[in-house]
From Swiss-Prot:
This is Tryptophan synthase alpha chain. Its EC number is 4.2.1.20. The active site is at residues 50, 61. It is an enzyme of class 4 (lyase). PANTHER family: TRYPTOPHAN SYNTHASE ALPHA CHAIN, CHLOROPLASTIC, TRYPTOPHAN SYNTHASE, ALPHA CHAIN. One of its GO terms (molecular function) is tryptophan synthase activity.
C-alpha cells in the first residue's frame, strides 16, 4: 500500500495546513491539454489530485462535471489514454497522492482486479467508487487491499452513527466528507455544519476527513479546516474554469493557477 496520503497529512499537520485537492476529468477537453491542466494544478500548489475517468452516465455529478465528461468523450479519449496521462503525471510528480473518483460500471467493464492493478501500475493511490456505499463494497475492498490501493468512502452529512463507524473501519487513505446531500456542483453552495460528523469520525479514528461538494471559494476552505476537516476538494469550480476558457488555453491555465493558489492559501492556519 502506498503511504503518500499518510505522508501528506503528517507533513501538512506539522506545518499547520490543510490539504487543497482539485478535481478534474481526465481528457477534458482533450488528451494533450488535459495533461497540461493537471500539470498546472500540481505546479500551482495542489496537495493531492482527485481525477475522474470519463463516463457516459455520471450519476452523482451536477451539470458542470457531466459536461466535462461529454467534452472528454467527444474528443475521443479512451481509458488507455487516461492511464497514459496518469503515468506521465506520476513520473513527473513522484510524491503527490493521486485519487480516482469513478463509477462501478467502469470498474466492472475492465474486471475489478485488472482495473485496480492498472491503476496501481499508473501510480494511482486511491479509488473512490461514487455509486458503491461502504456496506456494498466488499468485492472492491478486498481487491483494493490485495493490490495495495486505498479504498475511499463517502461520509454523507446525514449518515447514521453505525454508517460512520463502518466507513471509519473500512476506509483508508482519507474519508470523503460530503458537505451536503445531492449532486456535485457549485450550483448549490456547501453548507456546514459538519462539525458533528467530524467529531464522530475522529472518535472512530477514521482516515483523515476531506470536505467536498460545492466548495468554490477560499472562505469555504477556511471554514472546512476550522471545523476540523483535514482539507477540501473542489471539483465543479475547477472544471468551470476549463469550461469558461475552452477557446483560450493561456487564459484557462492562468485562471487555474490563480484559483489553486488562492484556495491553497486558505488552508494555511
Amino acid at each position: 500500500m502506498t503511504n503518500r496520503y499518510t505522508t501528506l497529512f503528517a507533513n501538512l499537520e506539522k506545518r499547520n495546513e490543510g490539504a487543497f485537492i482539485p478535481f478534474v476529468t481526465i481528457g477534458d477537453p482533450n488528451k494533450a491539454l488535459s495533461f497540461e491542466i493537471i500539470d498546472t494544478l500540481v505546479s500551482s500548489g495542489a496537495d493531492a489530485l482527485e481525477l475522474g475517468i470519463p463516463f457516459s452516465d455520471p450519476l452523482a455529478d451536477g451539470p458542470t462535471i457531466q459536461e466535462a465528461n461529454i467534452r472528454a468523450l467527444e474528443s475521443g479519449i479512451t481509458p488507455k489514454d487516461c492511464f497514459d496521462i496518469l503515468t506521465k503525471i506520476r513520473a513527473k510528480y513522484p510524491h503527490i497522492p493521486i485519487g480516482l473518483l469513478l463509477y462501478a460500471n467502469l470498474v466492472y467493464a475492465n474486471g475489478i482486479e485488472n482495473f485496480y492493478q492498472k491503476c496501481l501500475d499508473a501510480g494511482v493511490d486511491s479509488i473512490l467508487i461514487a455509486d458503491v456505499p461502504a456496506h456494498e463494497s466488499k468485492e472492491f475492498r478486498d481487491i483494493a487491499k490485495k493490490v495495495g490501493i486505498a479504498q475511499i468512502f463517502i461520509a454523507p452529512p446525514d449518515a447514521s452513527e453505525s454508517t460512520l463507524k463502518q466507513i471509519s473501519e473500512l476506509g483508508s487513505g482519507y474519508t470523503y466528507l460530503l458537505s451536503r446531500v445531492g449532486v456535485t456542483g457549485t450550483e448549490t453552495a456547501a453548507n456546514m455544519p459538519v462539525e458533528d460528523v467530524l467529531t464522530k469520525l475522529r472518535e472512530y479514528n477514521a482516515p483523515k476527513p476531506v470536505l467536498g461538494f460545492g466548495i468554490s471559494k477560499p472562505e469555504q476552505v477556511q471554514q472546512a479546516i476550522k471545523a476540523g476537516a483535514a482539507g477540501a476538494i473542489s471539483g465543479s469550480a475547477t472544471v468551470k474554469i476549463i469550461q469558461n476558457n475552452i477557446s483560450n488555453k493561456q487564459k484557462m491555465l492562468n485562471e487555474l493557477t490563480y484559483f489553486v493558489k488562492e484556495m491553497k492559501a486558505a488552508t494555511l492556519n
